[in-house]
Amino acid sequence: MPNFAGTWKMRSSENFDELLKALGVNAMLRKVAVAAASKPHVEIRQDGDQFYIKTSTTVRTTEINFKVGEGFEEETVDGRKCRSLATWENENKIHCTQTLLEGDGPKTYWTRELANDELILTFGADDVVCTRIYVRE
């Protein structure tokens, strides 16, 4: 079983602004979000298939608790409430599909994968994909 536990700092980010654009976030809010999310701090606790993930930026902190294979509620990148289901895509990668609780929007998901001592986080909105690479602190 892979060990996602630890504190992580972001090393690189690709397509975050494009992702927010695909989610319908206006230009002013995108500018603030991109600046605020430029140095997120991520804490992950793991007990087998049970995960706690806390992501902190200068303007927002999110926390999720979930068990792989069981549905849970969280928020999309742009703050809309959704029902999510995380599954193991392979032995080192979790894939989570999100379904909005209200309204319409693009199909969203996230993945977290361990590879070469890095945590690779992807967010997707329809065909737009944002990739963020983290290293352990």
Curated annotation (Swiss-Prot):
GO aspect biological process, one term: signal transduction
UniProt short sequence motif Nuclear localization signal, positions renumbered to this chain: 21-31
The protein's predominant localisation is: cytoplasm
Whether Phosphoprotein counts among this entry's keywords is no
For the ligand (all-trans-retinoate), the binding residues are 132-134
Is Hydrolase included in the keywords of this UniProt record?
Answer: no
Molecular-function GO terms, alphabetical:
fatty acid binding; retinal binding; retinoic acid binding; retinoid binding; retinol binding
| Compartments where located | Cytoplasm
User: Which PROSITE patterns does the UniProt record give?
Assistant: FABP
- Identify one Pfam family in the record: Lipocalin
Q: Which family does it belong to?
A: Belongs to the calycin superfamily. Fatty-acid binding protein (FABP) family.
The name of this protein is Cellular retinoic acid-binding protein 1
Tell me what organism the protein belongs to: Homo sapiens (Human)
